[in-house]
Amino acid sequence: MSDYKSTLNLPETGFPMRGDLAKREPGMLARWTDDDLYGIIRAAKKGKKTFILHDGPPYANGSIHIGHSVNKILKDIIVKSKGLSGYDSPYVPGWDCHGLPIELKVEQEYGKPGEKFTAAEFRAKCREYAATQVDGQRKDFIRLGVLGDWSHPYLTMDFKTEANIIRALGKIIGNGHLHKGAKPVHWCVDCRSALAEAEVEYYDKTSPSIDVAFQAVDQDALKAKFAVSNVNGPISLVIWTTTPWTLPANRAISIAPDFDYALVQIDGQAVILAKDLVESVMQRIGVTDYTILGTVKGAELELLRFTHPFMGFDVPAILGDHVTLDAGTGAVHTAPGHGPDDYVIGQKYGLETANPVGPDGTYLPGTYPTLDGVNVFKANDIVVALLQEKGALLHVEKMQHSYPCCWRHKTPIIFRATPQWFVSMDQKGLRAQSLKEIKGVQWIPDWGQARIESMVANRPDWCISRQRTWGVPMSLFVHKDTEELHPRTLELMEEVAKRVEVDGIQAWWDLDAKELLGDEADQYVKVPDTLDVWFDSGSTHSSVVDVRPEFAGHAADMYLEGSDQHRGWFMSSLMISTAMKGKAPYRQVLTHGFTVDGQGRKMSKSIGNTVSPQDVMNKLGADILRLWVASTDYTGEMAVSDEILKRAADSYRRIRNTARFLLANLNGFDPAKDMVKPEEMVVLDRWAVGCAKAAQEDILKAYEAYDFHEVVQRLMRFCSVEMGSFYLDIIKDRQYTAKADSVARRSCQTALYHIAEALVRWMAPILSFTADEVWGYLPGEREKYVFTGEWYEGLFGLADSEAMNDAFWDELLKVRGEVNKVIEQARADKKVGGSLEAAVTLFAEPELAAKLTALGDELRFVLLTSGATVADYNDAPADAQQSEVLKGLKVALSKAEGEKCPRCWHYTQDVGKVAEHAEICGRCVSNVAGDGEKRKFA
């Protein structure tokens, strides 16, 4: 028997079947770094229209987690897809480097500033620590395959950036948005500092819930208001609170002007409550025998005075819109120093903003004899005992409720009125302008707009001052007596910024006021406060984007972060940009959900359900992690587990196998001389290129809309359905058995080449390592990297006017599917082994029959059978299988006649008819020794 294997065009490629990504990717990264791939891309894209995705800086503390990976990979997919879309899209990664978490780490290792070393030395240690954290995170981000200017990132602790942050504050002051006030702010007693809204988390806490009676100063006046005289005992207005420790700061009782308030007689006294809450309050305090003596509107009680139960002064009843009937008594204990609503109404009524609590959370001396020096959370029991002793406590019980806590310490925080600096939301119209700007931004998903609108509409003034050591100084001088800002504040801030640009923030603390103020220095003091770190990151549109040369003065097109950043970076950036420039700092804002485990649970080390990106990269490779990110709908929670990553690895194998098939079958193909013109190609090959063209249109639309899971789904459909289960199966016969340089084979290779050129680019933003690997095996002259080019423009398709157009082949796909069902049944029944052992007869109605007949002898190649004939639908025998998909089709199967050709494996009756090649079929003889077979359709 002759060996005809050498006459076949068997697939061959050096592209490995196994990705072996965990081992192979680091080598690719080394090449990218050695070649300065990021620099090559920048040079290639120079002069193109820009797309700027501004990196929200992660905090320089700790290793990256799976959420960081999601964030950076999404950004990288966008930047790379924009590059392929013809944009110059520079990516400058950044880090947030100041603030409390770094201070705490340094304190743990070295102690607090002023103890073992100076504040200046402490700042130097903080800077050093942040730099090591940046280096660690940078290595992991690079390992993810994220391309960016990693050698020149922006750090909020860069001297120039620190200086520009000071300049941003100067601009805000110049525009009239800064004011000083003793407003209640979130205060962590462990941090001994104010906290931003975004630094507050909520946890369940058990607190005492108490009902307290404030006795009326003028009993007769109250009786007159209610038009009653027969009251037994004193009259009191009853408040309800879950923070007894705030009662020393009580300066009023708030009631609602439009609520009905009832005077209720109980045993030995009368109490005033909201009428709608009488029943629930009576149940709570255990009173069953009571009488409503009368009712009045809350407005009638305004400014009547009531005695504080133990502080020795009386307080007014005032009217407030914040009073509700959700719980309590309808009368709200009001302490302007301990709550934002209380503060606002206190300002309206001219109440004292009392703050009896020190920065460590203990009462200041002179507050009350049994409370001085006591921690506020330990004082609740003392206050309850005091109220009991004074006869003012109507009820006490334990209650679990959601309570604000410090994001760092996880401990309860307090509202505390302290002298702070604020960016005003309303004094110069910042709130109104911000709300206007929000409407001009595209929010992805679109619910983000309503979310941030609600936050901006309801947020208080922004407290931007902090009492910390490691932070950008506010760089202000205030008058010793008046506490007014120096009249030359903006000029002085610029002088400070120039010094900071050279020596960093330490320049402020080293500065002698006389250097800038001269003889005035004795009248002014340096403000010791630092800026909220959210001001640092929120001003990067100015301190970074406006000044980096690669951005060329363009504003950011996109901000992309997790959904918690509506109240964080998106908010602070919007506030600062609008306060500085009157406009939003971004055109698009995209948010992604949080990562959860396979059961939808939050990631937690204590549960043990965390997924480490480092582990995934070391086991499966970064491309698997990237494919998981891209294939998950980021608009909701993003589930990840070993099982989910295994599914991503399975999808990856399908894509890789498709790419490998294309490369292996392009062996020996030189596009410069072997390309077949479209009009000379086999029709099926043109259809396949048209499939790629349609897929590319869908994929590019999905990239443009940031619907990456749609990109992956379309890519998978193309690889699995259109290519894998149809086209690639059909062409194997022609590709392997036709003459090597025949039009039949070169047509097929031309199609594969066009498809591969498109496919490698579709993959590149997501499967960056694999795309780079594929790129290196593609035939023909090309740039060194796929990332410097653009989407492939060489695709074409069939015209609708052609007889064998897309609709024709779509119908053929269905016919092929129906034939496959019959073959599978025959294989199950042991009638045939493989499809080439079968011959099929297609009984079709006239319209379908005409289409099938048009393919002539090539119909069998489409169906992967050794024989295929078309007959009239009405002539079908009883055992012919009726198609469920095509009403006018029945399929009958028989065993193919003739012998099996050892070269092409088809069964034919002309095997051995040519004496010189007595073992193979006539078609193979032509391909081996003759002019070669001609293919027109398939």
Swiss-Prot record:
<keyword id="KW-0007">Acetylation</keyword>
<comment type="subunit">
    <text>Monomer.</text>
</comment>
<dbReference type="GO" id="GO:0005524">
    <property type="term" value="F:ATP binding"/>
</dbReference>
<dbReference type="InterPro" id="IPR009080">
    <property type="entry name" value="tRNAsynth_Ia_anticodon-bd"/>
</dbReference>
<dbReference type="InterPro" id="IPR001412">
    <property type="entry name" value="aa-tRNA-synth_I_CS"/>
</dbReference>
<feature type="binding site">
    <location>
        <position position="561"/>
    </location>
    <ligand>
        <name>L-isoleucyl-5'-AMP</name>
    </ligand>
</feature>
<dbReference type="InterPro" id="IPR010663">
    <property type="entry name" value="Znf_FPG/IleRS"/>
</dbReference>
<comment type="function">
    <text>Catalyzes the attachment of isoleucine to tRNA(Ile). As IleRS can inadvertently accommodate and process structurally similar amino acids such as valine, to avoid such errors it has two additional distinct tRNA(Ile)-dependent editing activities. One activity is designated as 'pretransfer' editing and involves the hydrolysis of activated Val-AMP. The other activity is designated 'posttransfer' editing and involves deacylation of mischarged Val-tRNA(Ile).</text>
</comment>
<dbReference type="GO" id="GO:0004822">
    <property type="term" value="F:isoleucine-tRNA ligase activity"/>
</dbReference>
<feature type="short sequence motif" description="'HIGH' region">
    <location>
        <begin position="58"/>
        <end position="68"/>
    </location>
</feature>
<keyword id="KW-0648">Protein biosynthesis</keyword>
<keyword id="KW-0862">Zinc</keyword>
<keyword id="KW-0030">Aminoacyl-tRNA synthetase</keyword>
<keyword id="KW-0067">ATP-binding</keyword>
<dbReference type="InterPro" id="IPR023585">
    <property type="entry name" value="Ile-tRNA-ligase_type1"/>
</dbReference>
<dbReference type="GO" id="GO:0005829">
    <property type="term" value="C:cytosol"/>
</dbReference>
<dbReference type="GO" id="GO:0006428">
    <property type="term" value="P:isoleucyl-tRNA aminoacylation"/>
</dbReference>
<feature type="modified residue" description="N6-acetyllysine">
    <location>
        <position position="183"/>
    </location>
</feature>
<feature type="binding site">
    <location>
        <position position="605"/>
    </location>
    <ligand>
        <name>ATP</name>
    </ligand>
</feature>
<feature type="binding site">
    <location>
        <position position="901"/>
    </location>
    <ligand>
        <name>Zn(2+)</name>
    </ligand>
</feature>
<keyword id="KW-0963">Cytoplasm</keyword>
<feature type="binding site">
    <location>
        <position position="904"/>
    </location>
    <ligand>
        <name>Zn(2+)</name>
    </ligand>
</feature>
<dbReference type="InterPro" id="IPR002301">
    <property type="entry name" value="Ile-tRNA-ligase"/>
</dbReference>
<keyword id="KW-0479">Metal-binding</keyword>
<keyword id="KW-0436">Ligase</keyword>
<feature type="binding site">
    <location>
        <position position="924"/>
    </location>
    <ligand>
        <name>Zn(2+)</name>
    </ligand>
</feature>
<dbReference type="InterPro" id="IPR009008">
    <property type="entry name" value="Val/Leu/Ile-tRNA-synth_edit"/>
</dbReference>
<dbReference type="InterPro" id="IPR002300">
    <property type="entry name" value="aa-tRNA-synth_Ia"/>
</dbReference>
<dbReference type="InterPro" id="IPR033708">
    <property type="entry name" value="Anticodon_Ile_BEm"/>
</dbReference>
<protein>
    <recommendedName>
        <fullName>Isoleucine--tRNA ligase</fullName>
        <ecNumber>6.1.1.5</ecNumber>
    </recommendedName>
</protein>
<dbReference type="Pfam" id="PF08264">
    <property type="entry name" value="Anticodon_1"/>
</dbReference>
<dbReference type="InterPro" id="IPR014729">
    <property type="entry name" value="Rossmann-like_a/b/a_fold"/>
</dbReference>
<dbReference type="GO" id="GO:0008270">
    <property type="term" value="F:zinc ion binding"/>
</dbReference>
<dbReference type="Pfam" id="PF00133">
    <property type="entry name" value="tRNA-synt_1"/>
</dbReference>
<feature type="binding site">
    <location>
        <position position="921"/>
    </location>
    <ligand>
        <name>Zn(2+)</name>
    </ligand>
</feature>
<dbReference type="Pfam" id="PF06827">
    <property type="entry name" value="zf-FPG_IleRS"/>
</dbReference>
<dbReference type="InterPro" id="IPR050081">
    <property type="entry name" value="Ile-tRNA_ligase"/>
</dbReference>
<feature type="short sequence motif" description="'KMSKS' region">
    <location>
        <begin position="602"/>
        <end position="606"/>
    </location>
</feature>
<dbReference type="GO" id="GO:0002161">
    <property type="term" value="F:aminoacyl-tRNA deacylase activity"/>
</dbReference>
<dbReference type="GO" id="GO:0000049">
    <property type="term" value="F:tRNA binding"/>
</dbReference>
<comment type="similarity">
    <text>Belongs to the class-I aminoacyl-tRNA synthetase family. IleS type 1 subfamily.</text>
</comment>
<keyword id="KW-0547">Nucleotide-binding</keyword>
